[in-house]
Amino acid sequence: MLGRSLLALLPFVGLAFSQSASQFTDPTTGFQFTGITDPVHDVTYGFVFPPLATSGAQSTEFIGEVVAPIASKWIGIALGGAMNNDLLLVAWANGNQIVSSTRWATGYVQPTAYTGTATLTTLPETTINSTHWKWVFRCQGCTEWNNGGGIDVTSQGVLAWAFSNVAVDDPSDPQSTFSEHTDFGFFGIDYSTAHSANYQNYLNGDSGNPTTTSTKPTSTSSSVTTGPTVSATPYDYIIVGAGPGGIIAADRLSEAGKKVLLLERGGPSTKQTGGTYVAPWATSSGLTKFDIPGLFESLFTDSNPFWWCKDITVFAGCLVGGGTSVNGALYWYPNDGDFSSSVGWPSSWTNHAPYTSKLSSRLPSTDHPSTDGQRYLEQSFNVVSQLLKGQGYNQATINDNPNYKDHVFGYSAFDFLNGKRAGPVATYLQTALARPNFTFKTNVMVSNVVRNGSQILGVQTNDPTLGPNGFIPVTPKGRVILSAGAFGTSRILFQSGIGPTDMIQTVQSNPTAAAALPPQNQWINLPVGMNAQDNPSINLVFTHPSIDAYENWADVWSNPRPADAAQYLANQSGVFAGASPKLNFWRAYSGSDGFTRYAQGTVRPGAASVNSSLPYNASQIFTITVYLSTGIQSRGRIGIDAALRGTVLTPPWLVNPVDKTVLLQALHDVVSNIGSIPGLTMITPDVTQTLEEYVDAYDPATMNSNHWVSSTTIGSSPQSAVVDSNVKVFGTNNLFIVDAGIIPHLPTGNPQGTLMSAAEQAAAKILALAGGP
């Protein structure tokens, strides 16, 4: 009988397959519950509560239902969504009766009998037959626990279930021991809509005329924070990573009225975010290393570089703003080619102009960042502009015509505002923070998304104050957005059972991370980390008698030139209002394979290193860095190692021989007329080494520009891409990515401008996609 009853029940609970609770009616009893059916094990969980009290305390009881196949040897429910410090209900079939108990655990050990006041009563509607067992029960004293924790029946929360196909040790004993569950999962529930005016009728065995009340009390609480157990607050959108993609998405989604949680694994950066890492000479201002543009080069020489991610083997920023808080801040509005279908963007993305316009209106670029409108330390610009004019280049204000990228040079452009580093932190994040529906948490690391098949239930964090054991759920139609950067997002996907099998198996070999993996039959095979790109870059070092190398930036943190420091502190003007880059240039090259490649150059006083047999004046050195960008064909692979550190598995630099040929041609062209500039000498490489020999000997690690894209690329097929045209991860219902990993091909300039325009467009597409909150 129960088997047919369950089949009749399935149409009513079909909506619950998304693993966010919805209402259904048991066709045998007529009782109306709120719950889910787990599609993997075909177990139904339902709950109904007494009517909400209009005054005074709420009732602490409910009626629950579990319908499970006979193969389910025991079922567990964690009322707070976690095993530890959470009221647990355990039940199994023993012959013609259901055996049940309330349990408690303070660690990942065998739960023991709960010593509180909760009372379980099996109701007469309980049935067992040859295929299924149904347990209908009353749980009194079950929403408030003796340790001070509980669930808030007026708000939203999360429940966890446990399933085992291994029988308990003594089925006749309610306190029997048993082996660890063979599977578990979570689901979100809106308790405020799970109350029924017919609750007393249900206790009397009468369904009455089932109606539910969805009226909320005038005052609600979203979480219970007393005691060691915390009930999680669900969000419409949980965004992982406060880099440029995450911040822009958070601002636009909260602007649309969505309840948004933004999580950042690192801490504050700029003064505005609560940062306090201030140079000794700048203490009166409170402006940090991340505020003052002229301190950029000191990021790489500091003895305590806490801002770099310690579990990623390349430079990656783990702080508010991500890479935009620690990069050189070069900022180029994308050109039409950067969003072309020819480089991999879906046709629906090619009209980037409205989104780039939204970006530039919020965050305009400047090529004269000093507040007095003057440019400083421009000697290298003057020298190289002469060199480039001799090669047929024209000078322009680069961002006035983003499509002009051949034989053009101009002053370096930045996303600084008022003489300080700005980017999305000073703009988009600030408007988001002003909204009551936006929550921002720092120093919270997300290890994985928690999912049941294709449905993401929430995220697992290291912060137990935000949810049971750190789990934070999304609302029934909620979504998760990963914006943790190319390496961070890839690792989260691997640890969530999404990606190439070898990467998930690497997670499986880690005893800590393996416990959070979904069952192998729920792994999603996608090319995460494949096809990664980064600009190969080569440094050429020169001297010229007019150059001021600015002590190679060595003294800017502890002992700057007094006049420059004083000028900056007075009104954010002068040398310290700008970063080290002074000039940028581009040139297009036709490769022998038919692809047009673009070379970009960046000029700055000083040098990261000098390797020369020639005598030289260190106070007169400057660097031209030459990159290859759009059109490059080389790709590599990023992933994780056995310690789960993000790392480069297959280097992507100059794998394609034509890429190398074009880069060498660009290097030769840059120095082709060096003799026409009196006093200009190239010292790295010097006369003892050809450019070919120099490139062949170049350390690949220093060829890395940290402009990683395409690791979770956008596309039309899960065989070749990770996200679809709505930036939704293939094989999932509600997981999205908004960071540089979705960019299918290197843009013509430094990628942060393209990324931020893409984030504007991604946020719009996510909001427009049906089925969301």
Swiss-Prot record:
CDD domains: CDH_like_cytochrome. Its EC number is 1.1.99.18. Residues 19-208 are annotated as: Heme domain. FAD binds at residues 236-265. Pfam families: CDH-cyt (PF16010), GMC_oxred_C (PF05199), GMC_oxred_N (PF00732), NAD_binding_8 (PF13450). One of its GO terms (cellular component) is extracellular region. Residues 210-227 have a biased composition (Low complexity). Residues 1-18 form the signal peptide. Coiled coil: none annotated. Residues 203-227 are annotated as: Disordered. InterPro entries: Cellobiose_DH-like_cyt, DOMON_domain, FAD/NAD-bd_sf, GMC_Oxidoreductase_CD, GMC_OxRdtase_N, GMC_OxRtase_C. The active site is at H707 (proton acceptor). SUPFAM superfamilies: CBD9-like, FAD-linked reductases, C-terminal domain, FAD/NAD(P)-binding domain. GO terms for molecular function: cellobiose dehydrogenase (acceptor) activity; flavin adenine dinucleotide binding; metal ion binding. Degrades both lignin and cellulose. Oxidizes cellobiose to cellobionolactone. This is Cellobiose dehydrogenase. It comes from Phanerodontia chrysosporium (White-rot fungus).
